[in-house]
Every structure is written in structure tokens, then in C-alpha cells.
Amino acid sequence: MSERDAIRAFSHMLETIFVRMRAEGTGSQTDAMQRWLDLYNVGSLPIDKKSYKALRLMDRETTDQQKEDATCAICLDNLQNNVDIPEDHVIKEELKIDPTTFGTTVIVMPCKHRFHYFCLTLWLEAQQTCPTCRQKVKTDKEVEEEERQRNLEELHDSMYG
């Protein structure tokens, strides 16, 4: 997916969120989303800064496992609600997930904050931190280096006990 397509998909998601919030008439949610948009410039990270592998390693839950009052801090929707994925959204091959699961999955980050999988993938296109506490998310390069180091240690241990 090109940067332009990612921005278009992200914009579509935000538009859907704003329409939903306007329909509900909750000004505080709209204000919160507007502040979020003002704080974060939606750009795309270079490919060596992506976090797809780290995302695949994070714990997963389904939307029906979430508490009634749990909210996704990215879209401000209840975590029990499935995400309506735009028809033109292309799921990145690196995520290795089927479209049905993508909309019903909640990711539990290492810091224990939970987000809709779809929302978090869009967030990680532009940021390398948890949207709530700003804990850094490892890049694919860092995950690969850790895996390489772990494999070397296992090989060493198997050879020298």
C-alpha cells in the first residue's frame, strides 16, 4: 500500500468516527478526537522503522472478551464493537491476518493497553509508541536482531551446554 493509500484509508476511518460521534451527539468525544488529530501529524514512517513483526508478537484477544466500558484510545469506540474496515482498505501482507479476524481482534500491547487491531496498525504507520503511555514499540529491525541474538545463544548453549 502506498503512503497515499494509507493516508486515504486513515482519513476514511477518521471520517467514519466523526460521523458516528456526531450522530451520538457527544461533544466531549469529538473534542478529544480533534485534540488527538491536532497533536499527531499523520505521516508515514520509513520502512526500516515499521513495527509489523512486533505487532504480530503482541497478545491478541477478541472484541467479545473486552470489558463493557473499555475504549480504544485511538478511535474512541468501545473495544467490544467490531471495527468496520473500509472496503478499499488493503491489509498489509506483513500482518499475516485474514480480513474477518482483523476487524474483530484487539491487540494487548506489552504495556497492557488495548486497541482495535485495525486502529493500531494505522497508528503504527505514523508513530512508534503506545498511543496511551508512549512506550516505544520495537521496529522490525530490532525484533529481527533480538531473534538473531536468541538463536545464537540457543546454538551456543546446544554446542557448549
From Swiss-Prot:
Q: What are the record keywords, sorted?
A: Metal-binding, Zinc, Zinc-finger
Q: Where is this region: Disordered?
A: 140-161
According to the record, the segments passing through the membrane are none
Q: Give the ZnF (RING-type) ranges.
A: 72-134
What the entry lists under InterPro entries is as follows:
HRD1_E3_ubiq-ligases, Znf_RING, Znf_RING/FYVE/PHD
One Pfam family, please name it.
zf-RING_2
Does the keyword section mention Metal-binding?
A: yes
Q: Name one GO molecular function term.
A: zinc ion binding
Q: Which PROSITE patterns match?
A: ZF_RING_2 (PS50089)
Protein name according to UniProt: Uncharacterized RING finger protein ZK637.14
Q: What organism, scientifically named, is this protein from?
A: Caenorhabditis elegans
